[in-house]
Amino acid sequence: LIVSLLLFLISCSKKEEDSSSTSSTVTCASSRTLTASTKVPLLVVRVQYANATFQSSQTTWADKMFGTSDGQLNHYLDETTYGKYQFTPATETSGCTNDGVVTVSMAENHPDTQGNSWACYAATAITAADSSVNFSAYDTDSNGKLSVAELQVIFLVAGGESAQSINSPGGVWGQAGSLTCDVNGDGGIVDEPCGSTPDNCHGVTLDSVRMLGMTSSTYGQNGFSQFGERQGNSPIDTWDATIGVMAHELGHAYFDLPDLYDTSAIGAGIGYFG
């Protein structure tokens, strides 16, 4: 009788463990039907650090970036481009396979670059993401480079969005640009070792393709965009970044749109509309 009771209790305990394990299973984003005439591949690289980890799940961000419901990026693009453009998830094997989001964890603390360049850290992050993505598959014209149209890459960095003065435990400034990294730390990039081709001064080579470098016709790479995870009114009153900053930076990165607000500090841009 005692043995039977013990076996019963062990069985109950095992069922509770199984139940707990099941309840903690990650729920992946459901498949979506995109209706735009042009579907642009987009890879979202979530980057977290030893002292700055994400407060929302990978699926939360996959929904926000690729979802088609009100308040999600593809819904906004569908409306504003009159059904011409949407972003489709890049093929990857991280976490929820093929939801377009790869999460990488850095061993060091957040670099807290704020308004300074985060490009060298972007190079490290995209290299860490390489094991989950076959970048060569996006080189559709087989020229050894990824262009703006072939693949967009946006980095979502755990911590704050410095453009809103949220820098705890570290912040980056939302922006779009190209990966030009001051490897030798002298404050400039023009004297970086380029080897036999200027292309080596910017971008990175992964899976035998050059990427994230300058987007001009001379170089023809895809650049990248970035933003901080948390926006807010103060360091103690924050929330996940809304789609405004994502749409804005991807507007620069893919559509090559200008800023409509004043960037010279001597004018008013186009006023309140911008």
Question: Predicted regions span which residues?
Answer:
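Metalloprotease/metallohydrolase-associated module, dominated by Zn2+-dependent proteases
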Residues: 272-274
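Active-site-proximal segment of zinc-dependent metalloprotease catalytic domains
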Residues: 25-269
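Bacterial N-terminal signal peptides
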Residues: 1-8
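Bacterial Sec-dependent N-terminal signal peptides
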Residues: 9-28
